[in-house]
Structures are given as structure tokens and as C-alpha cells.
Amino acid sequence: MLLNKITFFERFEHDILSGAKTITLRDEAESHVIVGQILPVSTFETERWFCDIQIIDVTPVKLTELTEVHAKQENMTLPQLRDVIAEIYPGLEQLFMIRFRILSQ
């Protein structure tokens, strides 16, 4: 079933709105989006809407395949990115990279 909204931790809001964060790494359950799809974006903590995004690409990627390029697209260093993934998805190897662009704020 396609997602009809997407949430991010509040700590990522500024990076998304500034354009510094252009991808999100999700597990399979949160990977059900299609190229061109438009989604409202809210904070995970309070479900407060803060922008809409359009999906540009969805690509499977393994945790061990993450590079500095992925980290830069997340506006983090590679060690920071791996730590965040381990915190959110402990023990998960298969991820999905969802590339997006902001449509409105």
C-alpha cells in the first residue's frame, strides 16, 4: 500500500527545509512510494505539517553500501549516518533510499 504521508524527526526539519537533506533512508515498510508522488511531510513527534515533497527516486541500498555521498545527501558524516540508522532501525541491513525535492513550505 502506498504511503499517503511521511514523517521525520523534528531534528531533521531545518535540513529538509534548507535543502541540505535530499534523501531519506527507510525500511521496507516505509518504502512504498513511487516516483512523482507528492507527500505531505510532518514531524514524527507531533505530526505537525511543515512541507510537501515530491519523490524523485526510490532505490534499495544495504547499510554496508552507504557512502559519503549518501551521508552528504542526509547532511551528515558517514559515521553519524550509520549511528542514526542503527538508532532508528537496529540490526537492519536492507534499506531504501528515497530521494525527494521540496514543493512547498
UniProtKB/Swiss-Prot annotation:
The keyword Hydrolase applies. Belongs to the N(4)-acetylcytidine amidohydrolase family. One of its GO terms (cellular component) is cytosol. One of its GO terms (molecular function) is hydrolase activity, acting on carbon-nitrogen (but not peptide) bonds, in linear amidines. The active site is at 21 (proton acceptor), 24 (nucleophile), 74 (proton donor). Pfam families: ASCH. Keywords: Hydrolase. Catalyzes the hydrolysis of N(4)-acetylcytidine (ac4C). InterPro entries: AC4CH, ASCH_domain, PUA-like_sf. It is an enzyme of class 3 (hydrolase). This is N(4)-acetylcytidine amidohydrolase. It catalyses: N(4)-acetylcytidine + H2O = cytidine + acetate + H(+); N(4)-acetyl-2'-deoxycytidine + H2O = 2'-deoxycytidine + acetate + H(+); N(4)-acetylcytosine + H2O = cytosine + acetate + H(+). Residues 7-93 form the ASCH domain. Its EC number is 3.5.1.135. The keyword RNA-binding does not apply. It comes from Shewanella baltica (strain OS195).
